[in-house]
Amino acid sequence: MAGRPVPAGRQEEELAKDPGQKLSLARPPGRLPSIDETRPAGPGPASRRGSVLGPASSFSRRNSLAGAGAGPGGRRPSLGPVPPLGWRVSFSGLPLGPARRPAPSYRTEPAPGERWEAARAQRALEAALAAGLRDARYVGAEAGRLARELCDLARVHLRELSPPRYKLVCSVVLGPRAGQGVHVPSRALWDTACDGLASATVTNASLFAVATVHGLYCE
């Protein structure tokens, strides 16, 4: 049997039945076969990772966990209520509703009963000057400070009586009383239907003071 030749056709048939025998013939004695040599021929991945995922698999674990409905970056869309367009959102994600804007309250003219009353303003101005100059004496170095104090005092007294939305402009002319004559003019650009003024003069043994207050309706 050992020296009997095997026909060529039968030899190819035996090699086809046992491909490992063919590899063992070409392998030198004493060498173990590698994984590539023992794997059957045919299409297939070359690694264990490839055998699990496949050559055409391109997704990652992050994408597989995110799901098909995930948004950009792999984040799932929120399940909370979606506020309408233009609404505000609180820190908790709940809609706050549109911001309420107060209606404009401006007026082009004073409301009925809220106009400037010149006679009432003049009485208040005279009382303020009399209280501020009761025992005052004229000193040139202190005349400026005294005039500013009289302006502030007159503004406080008239602010309590003036109608709302009115701005007050006060001026005081202060001088020594020495028998001279003085004329204090006043000129302003205003609305004769809404604006007004009050003027008062107070004198004592040492000085005189002329105060003028313009009440201007301002909106």
From Swiss-Prot:
Residues 10-20 have a biased composition (Basic and acidic residues). The modification Phosphoserine is found at residue 64. One of its GO terms (cellular component) is cytoplasmic dynein complex. One of its GO terms (biological process) is microtubule-based movement. The keyword Glycoprotein does not apply. Residues 1-84 are annotated as: Disordered. It holds the Pfam family Tctex-1. Its main location: other. It is found in: Cell projection, Cilium, Flagellum; Cytoplasmic vesicle, Secretory vesicle, Acrosome; Cytoplasm, Cytoskeleton, Cilium axoneme; Cytoplasm. Keywords: Cell projection, Cilium, Cytoplasm, Cytoplasmic vesicle, Cytoskeleton, Flagellum, Nucleus, Phosphoprotein. It comes from the Eukaryota. One of its GO terms (molecular function) is dynein intermediate chain binding. Interacts with ENG/endoglin, TGFBR2 and TGFBR3. Interacts with PPP1CC. Belongs to the dynein light chain Tctex-type family. This is Dynein light chain Tctex-type 4. It comes from Sus scrofa (Pig).
